[in-house]
Each structure stands twice: as structure tokens, then as C-alpha cells.
Amino acid sequence: MFSWLARMALFCLRPMRRYGRMNRDDDDDDDHDGDSSSSGDSLLWSRELERHSFGDFSIAVVQANEVIEDHSQVETGNGAVFVGVYDGHGGPEASRYISDHLFSHLMRVSRERSCISEEALRAAFSATEEGFLTLVRRTCGLKPLIAAVGSCCLVGVIWKGTLLIANVGDSRAVLGSMGSNNNRSNKIVAEQLTSDHNAALEEVRQELRSLHPDDSHIVVLKHGVWRIKGIIQVSRSIGDAYLKRPEFSLDPSFPRFHLAEELQRPVLSAEPCVYTRVLQTSDKFVIFASDGLWEQMTNQQAVEIVNKHPRPGIARRLVRRAITIAAKKREMNYDDLKKVERGVRRFFHDDITVVVIFIDNELLMVEKATVPELSIKGFSHTVGPSKFSIFLS
């Protein structure tokens, strides 16, 4: 039986709009871990399998919002690969800005320092944050609500056999490696490489309270959900200028984002948590995904799906599995949910972006593997040359 919300959504359907820039999901394979859908999802875009210097990658995006707020990219070069997942909120402006600028900042800083490092990642995040706040300053007179637009930002780089990850927000990078379980070495094990900067976690709430001891409303339980200042769940982001600088405060005509008291210090941070790992022979792949995926499945469930299925289309498979789970929560199946158009579909699941980077260990030893130097943007047919060539040449 459909829930009342599902019935309402299906009753209110308008004709589905199509996009020239989006690949229609035409997969008819009914082996999708419980997804027995018989036709494609017009809001699901993917690239099945591409090469990078150290293996393959697969990327998929599904739209739920009226205007998609997730942006993403994969940059491949001879001897390096870059992944970015940018989960926007309040609008697409911040995530789009990150997609257009962060990688260029990273290449500029890395070229100046002759290496890709944790410090280079931090500098790229800082430059991106300052650039977006400058954009907000220029445009907030005409568009005040741009001050309430922000984005989570998750990036990963593999270079010289090392994986570097930087993150603000609650997107995740999860490693799949062959570990031991009861003396068996053939079990895939999930290891979360990032921290969730989300007020749902007690340690995040404690951190905020310690940083703001004079503010009894720094975190508020609202309708069963912990929110910072009663407004937002993530504690770190790019953007969200109104929670960082008093000059961007919003007046009472925007009650959702109006703060009763002027900011004394930034409430949110754009400082990333950075992680470095020298890749081991047991490391098989990394899943980079926005929180729309992790709302529907655990880290271990995700790595097991990747491990037991063929590489081509694996990111799409993860997205479809997440949508199937979301549909079941509303007493629907995937075929029903595919009839729900963008905007209304946000009641059922978030925009979801998934990138799976496979690691072929023998290629880590190759100085410069010959692969196409490509720049691929999620949810877009546009493919161009990567700026990695500037740094790596």
C-alpha cells in the first residue's frame, strides 16, 4: 500500500521533463540488490566506467531537488586522479562555484609548491571559501538569500601512491579493503576515511558547545533533529555566509535564516579535516558520495555491493539501490518512484552523487600510466581536457 505522501505525490504528477545534458538510465538489468525495475530513471545520470592512472572509476548522479544542488567532478591525468563531490544546500550556487574553482586553486597552489599535499588542499579550500564569500558580497544586495547558500565539500587525490582526502560537511569517503575476519582474509572491510561534520553526532555538539560556551542555543533539538542555531545540521561548509560574518546577516523578512542576536564569532567553519594514506595492496577501492547515499545504507553495505558486482555501472548500481531503499520506506517500489518528478521527489530522497575509484595496485608502481587526461563533470555531457596536465607536465 502506498503511504499518503506517496499517493499525494503520484496524484499531483506533471509530465516528466527531460534534459538534453542528462543521460537517461536505460539499464534493464533486474539484478540490482532488490531493485527489479524494468525501465530507466530519467533523473539518473551516469558514466559506466572510465580509466584513471591507477585503475577505473564509475560515477552516477540522481536528481531529487527542483534544481539539482549536487555538483561533482573527476579529473584524470598521467600519474594522478582528483575526485570532488559538492553537496549544496539552500541552492546550487555554492556547489557550482566549488566545481568551477576549487580544482584550479589546488593546481595553482600545488604548482607553486611542486607537490600535492595536505597544506595545498587546505589552501585550496581557503581560496575557494574566500572567493565564494566575495561573490556573495557582490550579489547579496540584489539576491540576499545567496548569503544562506552553502555546500559540503569532499575531495580526494591519488598521487605518487598516496591518497589525500579533505572534507567539510557530511559527505563521506569510504575505503574498501581486504581485511581479516576470524582468520579469513577474503572479506571486504569498510573504513570511513572522513568525519561527519553534522550536529546529529554528540562529538560535534560537544565541539560546538566548547567553542561557544556563552551561547546556550548553539545547538538546538528541533522536531527531533539537532540543528546549529536551530537552522542547519552541518557544522562545516563552504558558504553559509550569514553564519560566519555579521555583514551577511539576514533581516527578519527572512525568518528562516534570521538570527535573534548578532554573531560574535563564526558559527560554521570552512576548515577541512584532511587525511593522508599511503595505499596498501589490500586497498581495493574508495567510494566518494554525498550524504544522500549514506542516509540509505551503511558503509559496509556499500562496499559489499561494490565488491560483489562487476565494475561497469557500479556507481549507478549504488544509486539505484539507495533509491530502492528510499522507496520501500514509503511503501513504494522503484518503478513507482521513477514516476515522481524532480522537486516532489525530494520528499523521498536527496540528490545523490556517487564516485567509485578502483585501485589496481600494480599500476601504483607505474611512474606515469598513459590514460586520457579528462575533466568529467557530474550530471553533464561536457568532457574536456583536465588541468592536471598543467601541474604534471
Curated annotation (Swiss-Prot):
Substrates-to-products reaction catalysed: O-phospho-L-seryl-[protein] + H2O = L-seryl-[protein] + phosphate; O-phospho-L-threonyl-[protein] + H2O = L-threonyl-[protein] + phosphate
Residues holding Mn(2+) 2: D87, D291, D350
Primary enzyme class: hydrolase
Positions annotated to bind Mn(2+) 1: D87, G88
Entry keyword annotation includes Nuclease: no
Record-linked CDD domains: PP2Cc (cd00143)
Entry cofactors: Mg(2+); Mn(2+)
Enzyme Commission number(s) of this protein: 3.1.3.16
InterPro entries on file: PP2C, PP2C_BS, PPM-type-like_dom_sf, PPM-type_phosphatase-like_dom
Gene Ontology molecular function: any one: protein serine/threonine phosphatase activity
Keywords of this entry: Hydrolase, Magnesium, Manganese, Metal-binding, Protein phosphatase
Annotated PPM-type phosphatase domain residues: 56-359
Domain of life: Eukaryota
Disruption phenotype: Plants missing PP2C42/PP2C-D2, PP2C64/PP2C-D5, PP2C79/PP2C-D7, PP2C63/PP2C-D8 and PP2C68/PP2C-D9 exhibit an increased hypocotyl length, as well as an enhanced sensitivity to LiCl and media acidification.
PROSITE patterns referenced in this protein's UniProt entry, alphabetically: PPM_1, PPM_2
Keyword Nuclease included in the entry's annotation: no
PANTHER family attached to this UniProt entry: PROTEIN PHOSPHATASE
Family membership: Belongs to the PP2C family.
Purpose of the protein: May dephosphorylate and repress plasma membrane H(+)-ATPases (PM H(+)-ATPases, e.g. AHA1 and AHA2), thus influencing negatively plant growth and fitness.
Name this polypeptide is given: Probable protein phosphatase 2C 68
Organism of origin: Arabidopsis thaliana (Mouse-ear cress)
Source species taxonomy: Eukaryota, Viridiplantae, Streptophyta, Embryophyta, Tracheophyta
